[in-house]
């Protein structure tokens, strides 16, 4: 076990912390035992008592000694270890109904896993867990992650399961794997996500579904005929919709409202979008993604990328969301529907050292949040604005204490709305309960290798892409800290701090 210990992170029901010893400000900001990481390693009182009992009973009987040793081993799981990011892999992201038109979720995630297995020599190894998910799934995607594992050279004994939290799926998968590693339940695992809108499931009307189920259980010809008579042509017209069930509005329509509320200009959105494309194009030219991407189906880079993008060119596009002259959101400053997959290899420090792998960074804190976008009319994609300050408070950090900011660019206006909220005294006081604004960030540290506006956004795959990118950035710098923020459907937000 690692020497690094802390109080049980489950004490805060809304957040978790995988311990890191690199955030020096935390010790001075610590208010209660459950708010942040202790400055020095500390043994759990339960574990210490167990060790004492084990010694005192050793002279009495071998049976009690064995029992105490076993209990000591079990109690060692209360020791929280640092969680290392070893590396990541993804396939190039592709615009919907294009290069990956004939690829399924399983095809894409299997290819991503195979690339990760090859890069880190995981052939034949039994990992502790593989956790991944997809937002859009067919019924044939039952047990998808496990089936993908069985398609790879990982040992068949590697367990796997699916999860889903909309656009936060990939990062949330990393949290689950990290928790198991931190608690000593596993040594190594993979977290990831995949999505395709090219191969989206098409649902029929509920009337047709019920008629077909009735037809399936019918025992006589008369019963079958009765079931068939219940089929109505209108039940064949229920096309897939990209909207919130509670409001009927799409993400773009929701964000158009938020952009208007925060006064986000068209020019600022286009500038952010153009910058994302330009920075990602430069990153490709520099070879930054060479060890983060596995070519797939003829692509070796994201085909949404527009290296020649400029704010002037984007300004010529017509608005796609919003109404009238106030509409500012276009196809150019919004992410397109995208297909792709990503995965990240996480491990304990001990496993990394034993297997000869360099640690890129450590996951130290993470937080999830949700807003009431139905009754309180909060912005659908503004939950990260709430998650980040809670996470900063536990970490004993300020918004300015970061070398990199990796903020998911679902829409340029979403990023800008969030940043503006953190600078706004009224929002920070009335919504966040803070005495003063969080303040502004150094924009030169924002999405320095480009982000979703350039790469695209396969919903569940975005978290893995961002986590792997941030970890590599920190490792290249040698030391540092990155803030990760991802908004998600349903009024949710998933955020993390990684450092080295």
Q: What does each model-identified segment do?
A:
Residues 1-73:
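Intrinsically disordered, polybasic Lys/Arg-rich low-complexity tracts
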Residues 72-103, 227-234, 240, 315-386, ...:
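Condensing-enzyme catalytic core mediating Claisen C-C bond formation in acyl metabolism
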Residues 90-91, 101-111, 119, 231, ...:
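N-terminal extracellular/periplasmic Venus flytrap/periplasmic-binding protein-like
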Residues 91-114, 118, 137, 161-175, ...:
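Active-site pocket-shaping loop/turn-to-helix segments
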Residues 101-189, 193-216, 287, 293-303, ...:
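Conserved beta-ketoacyl condensing-enzyme motif
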Residues 134-189, 232, 246-250, 308-336, ...:
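Conserved catalytic cysteine-centered active-site region
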Residues 165-195, 203, 259-288, 343-351, ...:
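Active-site-proximal alpha-helical scaffold in enzymes
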Residues 188-257:
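Flexible glycine-/small-residue-enriched beta->alpha junction loops
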